[in-house]
């Protein structure tokens, strides 16, 4: 009787460490701790109303957004799991105004962890897929982190990933050597490699955008979406479908698996605040993953990974996904400026 050998996340990381020689042991251990925290978050999400974790917490985060109970719980799970391991100098989160230095009573490491503990949390109460997004940077100041230590462009990321808590719980990871997907086997509690070297098709007929904001869009985005909506009779000569989950991890995961373009552009409502998504813990890690899978990511005017951050909670426009479509939108932005 043959036994199918399965590759767990731990085995995969150890093999990468041996084969590529560019995955330090501390980084491998850090990724495993983050993945373990995501398992705990998945467990709490799956309990739903049975865990008394639905609804709002009666507080707001630094962006002025109402915090859900699971937002706060997920943030605490990630902090508690990572503060004592000796791999980190500091952490930063969507749910905290300032960064979190590793307490003096724990050993400190050379890495910085930035995360959105529960992306798409507006969907919690209606049981739509949500997730966790994270990014890992090296601390340029050794083990004494400051806020400035975090303000590195996305090209400096050494690892990035996300978990999706949906019909299956999956963990998607890149360390700069392609993108792989692991599925949580709840019977044994292990992450098992289920998709290797994911690639985003260069062309697509699907797009994701919140069309209710159409009246606020700037001309390049309006031009692009109008062309898609014109269908086979329009300038593109083919029909396109719109998909919008209002959960970035879910929308990006779909694009990673079957192609598409995701857009959360700047609009005219807030000209002084370019975009809604946060650069450090949403746009950068997702852009790293998308580029590693053969896609592209831009603000419309600049490659997202080249943006120099000015603050932990900086916002940027985000257009990412299938390469040819992203490049078309970028070209429309450039033409509008010329």
From Swiss-Prot:
Residues given in the record as Mg(2+) 2 binding sites: 116, 119, 282
UniProt entry tagged with the keyword Oxidoreductase: no
Positions contributing to Mg(2+) 1 binding: 94, 116, 118
UniProt pathway annotation: Carbohydrate biosynthesis; gluconeogenesis
Cofactor requirements of the protein: Mg(2+)
InterPro entries according to UniProt: FBPase_C_dom (IPR044015), FBPase_class-1 (IPR000146), FBPase_N (IPR033391), FBPtase (IPR028343)
Pfam families per record: FBPase (PF00316), FBPase_C (PF18913)
GO cellular component terms given for this protein: cytosol
Cofactor binding description: Binds 2 magnesium ions per subunit.
EC number: 3.1.3.11
Record-level Gene Ontology MF annotations: fructose 1,6-bisphosphate 1-phosphatase activity; magnesium ion binding
Keyword Glycosyltransferase tagged: no
Coiled coil: none
An example Gene Ontology biological process: fructose 6-phosphate metabolic process
Binding site for substrate: 119-122, 210, 276
Subcellular location: Cytoplasm
Record's keyword terms, sorted: Carbohydrate metabolism, Cytoplasm, Hydrolase, Magnesium, Metal-binding
Reaction(s) the record says it catalyses: beta-D-fructose 1,6-bisphosphate + H2O = beta-D-fructose 6-phosphate + phosphate
Subunit structure: Homotetramer.
NCBIfam families xref list: PRK09293.1-1, PRK09293.1-3, PRK09293.1-4
Entry's family note: Belongs to the FBPase class 1 family.
Record-linked HAMAP family: FBPase_class1
Protein name: Fructose-1,6-bisphosphatase class 1
């Amino acid at each position: 009787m043959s036994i199918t050998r399965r590759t767990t996340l731990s085995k995969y990381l150890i093999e990468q460490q041996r084969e590529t020689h560019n995955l330090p042991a501390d980084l491998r251990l850090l990724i495993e701790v983050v993945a373990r925290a995501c398992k705990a978050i998945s467990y709490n999400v799956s309990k739903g109303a049975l865990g008394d974790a639905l609804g709002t917490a009666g507080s707001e985060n630094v962006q002025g957004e109402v915090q859900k109970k699971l937002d706060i719980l997920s943030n605490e799970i990630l902090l508690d799991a990572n503060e004592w391991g000796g791999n980190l100098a500091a952490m930063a989160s969507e749910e905290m105004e300032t960064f979190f230095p590793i307490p003096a009573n724990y050993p400190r490491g050379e890495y910085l962890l930035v995360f959105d503990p529960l992306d798409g949390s507006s969907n919690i109460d209606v049981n739509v897929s949500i997730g966790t997004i994270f990014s890992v940077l090296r601390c340029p100041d050794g083990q004494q982190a400051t806020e400035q230590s975090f303000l590195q462009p996305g090209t400096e990321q050494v690892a990035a990933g996300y978990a999706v808590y949906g019909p299956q719980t999956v963990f998607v990871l890149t360390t700069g050597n392609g993108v792989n997907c692991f599925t949580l086997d709840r019977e044994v509690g292990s992450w098992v490699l289920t998709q290797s070297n994911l690639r985003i098709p260069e062309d697509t007929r699907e797009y994701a955008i919140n069309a209710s904001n159409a009246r606020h869009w700037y001309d390049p985005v309006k031009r692009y979406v109008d062309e898609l909506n014109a269908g086979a009779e329009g300038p593109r000569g083919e029909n396109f479908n719109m998909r919008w989950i209002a959960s970035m991890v879910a929308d990006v995961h779909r694009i990673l698996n079957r192609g598409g373009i995701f857009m959360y552009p700047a609009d005219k409502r807030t000209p002084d605040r370019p975009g809604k998504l946060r650069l450090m813990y949403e746009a950068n890690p997702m852009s790293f993953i998308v580029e590693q899978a053969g896609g592209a990511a831009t603000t419309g005017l600049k490659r997202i990974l080249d943006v120099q951050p000015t603050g932990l909670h900086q916002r940027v426009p985000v257009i990412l996904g299938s390469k040819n479509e992203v490049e078309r939108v970028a070209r429309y932005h450039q033409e509008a400026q010329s």
